[in-house]
Amino acid sequence: MSEGLYEKFLAPDEPFPLLSQQRGSVSEEGCLDVSDFGCQLSSCHRTDPLHRFNSNRWNLTSCGTSVASSECSEELFSSVSVGDQDDCYSLLDDQDFTSFDLFPEGSVCSDVSSSISTYWDWSDSEFEWQLPGSDIASGSDVLSDVIPSIPSSPCLPSKKKNKHRNLDELPWSAMTNDEQVEYIEYLSRKVSTEMGLREQLDIIKIIDPTAQISPTDIEFIIELNCLTDEKLKQVRSYIKEHSPRQRSTRESWKRSSYSTASTSGVSGASVSSSSASMVSTASSTGSSGGNSASNSSANMSRTHSDSNLSASAAERIRDSKKRSKQRKLQQKALRKRQLKEQRQARKERLSGLFLNEEVLSVKVNEEDHEGDVDVLI
């Protein structure tokens, strides 16, 4: 079935007029001299496969879409027909088929031909000729069986993503701009969430010793040019030293050392009573050494917390105390004046001197004087 279809496709019944006129230019080996043709071999024209099969003609149209139609003559759109099976074999087997000088040097079509020849390698290794294995009615694409496969362009190699580096081990100068911004944001979150106000101020002083911070500031902007390798090293060591885990360890060590010192200092009942009286007057003289040590530690922790108050908080406390004192003084003065008025009214009522007293209201309308009055005359 395939051989009959192959012969029907390559060996039509009627001779073609184009090749019948050019029979003298075909050599014995079957090479076609196409120097008289003014066409350019370019990409195959995608016509209807059934129409091209029925017309028994292999159309190779010329002049690609990049060439203006005004610059191409009518001969450029002529078709080359292969009417003999031997000629078709010779065309396929000839290695020098692309060496035909179809156009004179310097013409527009020669430039297009050179550009196409660099894109399409017309060697036998690139041709993949396939014969249809079934009838056309079965849906096989004749065009895909005849047109040689175009070599696909090589895919661009995908760029490998940079691995995420450990920024805690890199110096400041070895980081890129994006890594510096990312690390600054990481430090800001870590310091603001895990450390207190004093530690934050210390880190700001390390980064920018000339920074001026007011009590009303709620944020501090870190400039990238302020940091260096040495400053970043100091900040890392400070954060490592004052991390919450290290701070809890130090506080537990201080509490244990203070408790051992207080228990060793208290030796008798007299010493315990004196320490208790120094801490609070409400404690009894006969309290044990453990009670006195706990009271003294509580008092010291309270004074330590008071000393850690910020200046703004202490100022607010002083203002509230001052306002409460002024309010008490005003209430005391008002109460004193009310008592004095009540006492005076009682005296007047007991004396009886003001029983016939009448209160008159006088209203005086002042008239506008035309001129000034000299009171000295």
Curated annotation (Swiss-Prot):
Residues 240-348 are annotated as: Disordered. Residues 319-338 have a biased composition (Basic residues). Residues 256-301 have a biased composition (Low complexity). Keywords: Coiled coil. The keyword Plastid does not apply. Residues 240-254, 339-348 have a biased composition (Basic and acidic residues). Residues 321-350 form a coiled coil. InterPro entries: FAM199X_fam (IPR029672). PANTHER family: PROTEIN FAM199X. Belongs to the FAM199 family. This is Protein FAM199X-A. It comes from Xenopus laevis. The lineage of its organism: Eukaryota, Metazoa, Chordata, Craniata, Vertebrata. The gene is fam199x-a.
